[in-house]
C-alpha cells in the first residue's frame, strides 16, 4: 500500500528528465507510487526511469515565428492536453510536478483544470518560457538556481537541482591530481544532445598541444552520431586513447575519474559537476533565448570551480593554452575541484521531495519555508 501517486511531467531532453529521475527515486523511497508523463522525444532517455508506469502524450515546442508552424504546435499541444486530462482523471494523483519544457504544459494545465495540486521545478538561473507561462498557475515553484525573491517569492522554495543516484555515488570518489608523466583524464560532453562545436575545437586543440602533454591524455568525448566516427579517427591519428560515443550510460563515473571536464553549462550538468566536484571549462550554449546557461555557469565559476569561455572565444589556440596550464598545475586543479564541490547541492532531491510531500499532504507551503529558514 503506497501513500498515493505522484505524477512527474518531464520531456524534451535528458536535461529535464535527470532531475525528475532523482526525485522519483526519493519519492519511491518515501512510499509513494511514481508515474512519468513524457513526450516521444524523451522516451530514449526514460528506459531506466524508476517509475511504476510511463505515459507518452503528444507535445510540441513553439520555436518558430511561422504562423502555420505555430498553429500546428498549438494543435498538438491541445491534443496533448486532452490526452493528459484523460490520463490524470484516471490516475487521480496527489500532485503533478513539471520539470520545464513545452511537454509539461498539457499535463500541468490538465491537472489544474481537474483540481489537482501542481508544482514546477525550474532548473536554470533564468526561468524558461514554459515555466514562465505556468508559474502564476501552480501552487508552488521549486528552484535549482533561481533567486528566492521575485514575483513569486511567496511560493518559491530554492531546493537545488536533484541529481541521480549514480552522481551521488560518483561523488564519493576523491579528486586525484595528475602529476608530471601521469595519465590525464579529460571528459568532453555537450549535454544529452551533444555539442558539434566540441567535435571540431577539442581535437584541433589537442593537435597543437606539445607531444609530452598529448601523450598523457586519455579522453572521453560525447559526440553527435554524425560526428562520432570522424572524431574517433582524429584521435586515432593523434595516437590519443579516446572513447567517443553519442551517449555514455556511465558518464557520472567517467567524470569522477577525470582530472578536467569541458562541457556546456546546462542546469543538470552544472549541478552534477558541483556534486561530484570536478574542475571544468564551461562553454554556455550561445543560442539560448534567455542566456540561461551563462547564468548557470556563474553559480560554479563564482566559487572558483570552473572557467567560463564563450563559444566565440573557444579557439583551438585558446583551448590548447588552457589545457597546457591546467595539465601542468595539479595543485590548481585540486583547489578548483574543491571549489566546485563547495557549490554542489547533494541534498537537493530530498529538499524537493519535502516540498512535494508538503503539497501532497495538503499542508501550507509556509510550514516548509519556516523549517528551511
From Swiss-Prot:
Belongs to the glycosyltransferase 28 family. MurG subfamily. It is a peripheral membrane protein. GO terms for molecular function: UDP-N-acetyl-D-glucosamine:N-acetylmuramoyl-L-alanyl-D-glutamyl-meso-2,6-diaminopimelyl-D-alanyl-D-alanine-diphosphoundecaprenol 4-beta-N-acetylglucosaminlytransferase activity; undecaprenyldiphospho-muramoylpentapeptide beta-N-acetylglucosaminyltransferase activity. InterPro entries: GlcNAc_MurG, Glyco_trans_28_C, GlycoTrans_28_N. Its EC number is 2.4.1.227. It comes from the Bacteria. Cell wall formation. Catalyzes the transfer of a GlcNAc subunit on undecaprenyl-pyrophosphoryl-MurNAc-pentapeptide (lipid intermediate I) to form undecaprenyl-pyrophosphoryl-MurNAc-(pentapeptide)GlcNAc (lipid intermediate II). Pathway: Cell wall biogenesis; peptidoglycan biosynthesis. It is found in: Cell inner membrane. It is an enzyme of class 2 (transferase). GO terms for biological process: carbohydrate metabolic process; cell division; cell wall organization; lipid glycosylation; peptidoglycan biosynthetic process; regulation of cell shape. UDP-N-acetyl-alpha-D-glucosamine binds at residues 13-15, 124, 164, 192, 293. It catalyses: di-trans,octa-cis-undecaprenyl diphospho-N-acetyl-alpha-D-muramoyl-L-alanyl-D-glutamyl-meso-2,6-diaminopimeloyl-D-alanyl-D-alanine + UDP-N-acetyl-alpha-D-glucosamine = di-trans,octa-cis-undecaprenyl diphospho-[N-acetyl-alpha-D-glucosaminyl-(1->4)]-N-acetyl-alpha-D-muramoyl-L-alanyl-D-glutamyl-meso-2,6-diaminopimeloyl-D-alanyl-D-alanine + UDP + H(+). One of its GO terms (cellular component) is plasma membrane. Keywords: Cell cycle, Cell division, Cell inner membrane, Cell membrane, Cell shape, Cell wall biogenesis/degradation, Glycosyltransferase, Membrane, Peptidoglycan synthesis, Transferase. This is UDP-N-acetylglucosamine--N-acetylmuramyl-(pentapeptide) pyrophosphoryl-undecaprenol N-acetylglucosamine transferase.
Amino acid at each position: 500500500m503506497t501513500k498515493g501517486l505522484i505524477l512527474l511531467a518531464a520531456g524534451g531532453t535528458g536535461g529535464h528528465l535527470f532531475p525528475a529521475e532523482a526525485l522519483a527515486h526519493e519519492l519511491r523511497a518515501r512510499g509513494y507510487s511514481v508515474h512519468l508523463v513524457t513526450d516521444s522525444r524523451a522516451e530514449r532517455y526514460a528506459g531506466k526511469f524508476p517509475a511504476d508506469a510511463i505515459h507518452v502524450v503528444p507535445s510540441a515546442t513553439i520555436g518558430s515565428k511561422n504562423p502555420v508552424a505555430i498553429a500546428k504546435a498549438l494543435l498538438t499541444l491541445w491534443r496533448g492536453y486532452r490526452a493528459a486530462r484523460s490520463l490524470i482523471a484516471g490516475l487521480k494523483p496527489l500532485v503533478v510536478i513539471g520539470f520545464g519544457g513545452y511537454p509539461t504544459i498539457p499535463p500541468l494545465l490538465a491537472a489544474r483544470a481537474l483540481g489537482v495540486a501542481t508544482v514546477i521545478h525550474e532548473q536554470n538561473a533564468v526561468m524558461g518560457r514554459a515555466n514562465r507561462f505556468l508559474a502564476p498557475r501552480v501552487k508552488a515553484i521549486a528552484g535549482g538556481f533561481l533567486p528566492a525573491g521575485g514575483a513569486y517569492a511567496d511560493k518559491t522554495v530554492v531546493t537545488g537541482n536533484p541529481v541521480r543516484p549514480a552522481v551521488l555515488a560518483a561523488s564519493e570518489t576523491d579528486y586525484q591530481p595528475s602529476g608530471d608523466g601521469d595519465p590525464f583524464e579529460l571528459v568532453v560532453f555537450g549535454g544529452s544532445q551533444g555539442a558539434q562545436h566540441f567535435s571540431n575545437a577539442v581535437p584541433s586543440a589537442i593537435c597543437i598541444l606539445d607531444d609530452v602533454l598529448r601523450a598523457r591524455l586519455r579522453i572521453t568525448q560525447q559526440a553527435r552520431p554524425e560526428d562520432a566516427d570522424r572524431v574517433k579517427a582524429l584521435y586515432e591519428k593523434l595516437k590519443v586513447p579516446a572513447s567517443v560515443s553519442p551517449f555514455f550510460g556511465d558518464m557520472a563515473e567517467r567524470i569522477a575519474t577525470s582530472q578536467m571536464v569541458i562541457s556546456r553549462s546546462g542546469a543538470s550538468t552544472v549541478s552534477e559537476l558541483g556534486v561530484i566536484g570536478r574542475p571544468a571549462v564551461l562553454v554556455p550554449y550561445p543560442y539560448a533565448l534567455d542566456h540561461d546557461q551563462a547564468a548557470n555557469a556563474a553559480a560554479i565559476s563564482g566559487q572558483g570551480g570552473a572557467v567560463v569561455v564563450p563559444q566565440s572565444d573557444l579557439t583551438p589556440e585558446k583551448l590548447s593554452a588552457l589545457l597546457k596550464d591546467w595539465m601542468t598545475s595539479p595543485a590548481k586543479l585540486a583547489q578548483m575541484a574543491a571549489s566546485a564541490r563547495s557549490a554542489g547541492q547533494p541534498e537537493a532531491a530530498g529538499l524537493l521531495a519535502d516540498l512535494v510531500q508538503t503539497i501532497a499532504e495538503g499542508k501550507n507551503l509556509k510550514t516548509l519555508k519556516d523549517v528551511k529558514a
